[in-house]
């Protein structure tokens, strides 16, 4: 009987240390992208902040987005992404959602608390929440 009691106490202690399910950490509450069309140019004002929140380098996010849009662009000193071409905010948000699913979200626990790691020619998403390591398609 005492071993069963100890087991239950250890389980209770374990569950008390686990994070609450559905609780959102810092990276979970992502800012909305601020997108402007000026003439034939599209600007994303808070691009650098967004990339910082998802723990990805600006150039990796930019490379994915520009490749999908088939348009040239660059990040300026203020952290704004400037894309040559007129694109709707809906198109850009859809592409960023795809980027999140493919290169940020942990496939095991669905957390956005991950880092992108490159070993030789392989890319991996390493989850900081559950420790899973998932291979992804190279950029």
From Swiss-Prot:
Gene3D superfamilies: 3.30.30.170. It comes from the Archaea. InterPro entries: IF2/IF5, TIF2_bsu_arc, Transl_init_fac_IF2/IF5_dom, Transl_init_fac_IF2/IF5_N, Transl_init_fac_IF2/IF5_Zn-bd. Keywords: Initiation factor, Protein biosynthesis. One of its GO terms (molecular function) is translation initiation factor activity. Pfam families: eIF-5_eIF-2B (PF01873). Heterotrimer composed of an alpha, a beta and a gamma chain. Belongs to the eIF-2-beta/eIF-5 family. eIF-2 functions in the early steps of protein synthesis by forming a ternary complex with GTP and initiator tRNA. This is Translation initiation factor 2 subunit beta. It comes from Saccharolobus islandicus (strain L.S.2.15 / Lassen #1). The gene is eif2b.
